[in-house]
UniProtKB/Swiss-Prot annotation:
Obligatory cofactor(s): Mg(2+)
Family: Belongs to the arthropod phospholipase D family. Class II subfamily.
Function: Dermonecrotic toxins cleave the phosphodiester linkage between the phosphate and headgroup of certain phospholipids (sphingolipid and lysolipid substrates), forming an alcohol (often choline) and a cyclic phosphate. This toxin acts on sphingomyelin (SM). It may also act on ceramide phosphoethanolamine (CPE), lysophosphatidylcholine (LPC) and lysophosphatidylethanolamine (LPE), but not on lysophosphatidylserine (LPS), and lysophosphatidylglycerol (LPG). It acts by transphosphatidylation, releasing exclusively cyclic phosphate products as second products.
Species this chain originates from: Sicarius cf. damarensis (strain GJB-2008) (Six-eyed sand spider)
Protein name: Dermonecrotic toxin SdSicTox-betaIIB1bvii
Length: 274
């Protein structure tokens, strides 16, 4: 999975897909009451990027629904995963539950259209810190209360704050989540990051019977040397400001026979068995 990073303006969706991404990440900004308002990162952000691009969240969902719906004029077959980077760290943890309710309802109304949409992308909920786990509880409660629990099959969980992996496991245990879990490891493209935690996550992913990590990705990679390093370690995905660079690296002799781009037929919740 090549995840285009910080794709917050509607016009950026095609831009990143044209560069080779098969997944996009966008930031969800909330008001003080936990209501999702816009797709927006804000300052500071990655080096070399404009931090202020944005869209109304519901309008963004309406557009991305079309982009991921077969036979729609806007349909782009390659886009199979949407990562919602939830900026919960900007609001009180007491509002995390309200935020989870709101995002679930907006996805129901504008993306899935309560069963009337054929939009097919998988959804990855990126939670910044484990203290915000009530967002996940609320999201799942809302799908159940609204009568659409089946959409849980399309939704995965990912904690992005580089916290202790055992601490993350404990929170997932509290929530009763034993599947559909991704684990991110990374830092803004402005800085270098070691591989200790990334290697630990990959080791846990590959441990038989360990159900708290199905996929691991590294972020935000812009240098080809770091992309190569991550691929050699065996990551499932790369988040990048430059998907075209990832494509070029994947075509190199060292990687061409080991990796390919994920398609809709690849289940993002299953561990890869090479």
């Amino acid at each position: 999975w090549i995840m285009g990073h910080m794709v917050n303006a509607i016009e950026q969706v095609d831009e990143f897909l044209n560069l080779g991404a098969n997944a996009i990440e966008f930031d969800i900004d909330f008001d003080k009451d936990g209501i999702a308002q816009i797709t927006h990162h804000g300052i500071p952000c990655d080096c070399g990027r404009k931090c202020t691009k944005k869209a109304i969240f519901t309008e963004y969902l309406d557009n991305i629904r079309q982009v991921t719906t077969p036979d729609d004029p806007k349909f782009r077959e390659q886009l199979v995963l949407l990562a919602l980077d939830l900026k919960l760290q900007r609001i009180s943890s007491a509002k995390a539950y309200r935020a989870g309710e709101d995002v679930a309802k907006k996805l129901l109304d504008h993306y899935w259209q309560r069963g009337n949409s054929r939009a097919r992308a998988y959804i990855l909920l990126n939670i910044p810190l484990v203290e915000d786990y009530e967002f996940i509880r609320a999201f799942k409660d809302t799908l159940k209360n609204e009568g659409y629990e089946s959409y849980n099959d399309k939704v995965g969980i990912n904690f992005t704050g580089n916290e202790d992996l055992d601490k993350i496991r404990d929170v997932l245990e509290i929530l009763g989540i034993h599947k559909q879990v991704w684990q991110a490891d990374g830092i803004t493209s402005c800085f270098a990051r070691g591989t200790e935690r990334l290697k630990e996550a990959l080791e846990k992913r590959d441990t038989p019977g360990y159900n708290y990590i199905n996929k691991v990705y590294a972020w935000t990679l812009v240098r080809k040397s770091i992309m190569r390093r991550s691929l050699r370690l065996g990551v499932d995905g790369v988040m990048s400001n430059n998907p075209d660079r990832v494509i070029k690296v994947l075509k190199e002799k060292e990687f061409a026979d080991k990796f390919r781009l994920a398609t809709y037929n690849d289940n993002p919740w299953e561990k890869f068995r090479g």
